[in-house]
Amino acid sequence: MSKYRVVVVGGWCGNRMFMVAEQLKEMLAAAGYACDVTTHSVWENYSRPPAANLLLQLLPAFTEAEAGCPVLTVKPLIVDLQHAATLDRILKQVQASYPA
């Protein structure tokens, strides 16, 4: 993978999964991180998650062993796109694992 890839995993949360992905893409870009932020709906396709550097789950779907990368639960973003503690955890994980 040449670009840092973040995948937002959701299911029956509908448009919220896309809203979360867009919010995170903007937040990470503003922080200076060039990331490819995509979505994966387990409701439509319960297959292995796409290859990524970081998996963000709106519902429990995959383990780190299955994903092959760090996995964070970001369920609070379903209700509040600005949930500070969750956004901080995501940013810290990206900072820790973003290629130099």
Please place each PLM-identified region on the residue numbering.
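Alpha-helix N-cap/helix-start motif
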Residues: 17, 48, 64, 82-83
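Short, charged N-terminal beta->alpha structural module
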Residues: 3-36
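Structural signal for conserved beta-strand scaffold positions within catalytic alpha/beta enzyme cores
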Residues: 39, 57, 72-73
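Conserved acidic residues
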Residues: 52-53
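Cytosolic covalent-transfer regions centered on His/Cys nucleophiles
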Residues: 2-5, 18, 25, 64, ...
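A short, well-structured beta->alpha microelement
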Residues: 29-49
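Ser/Thr/Gly-rich flexible loops in soluble cytosolic domains mediating phosphotransfer, phosphorylation
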Residues: 20, 70-100
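Short, polar loop motifs at secondary-structure junctions
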Residues: 42-43, 56-63
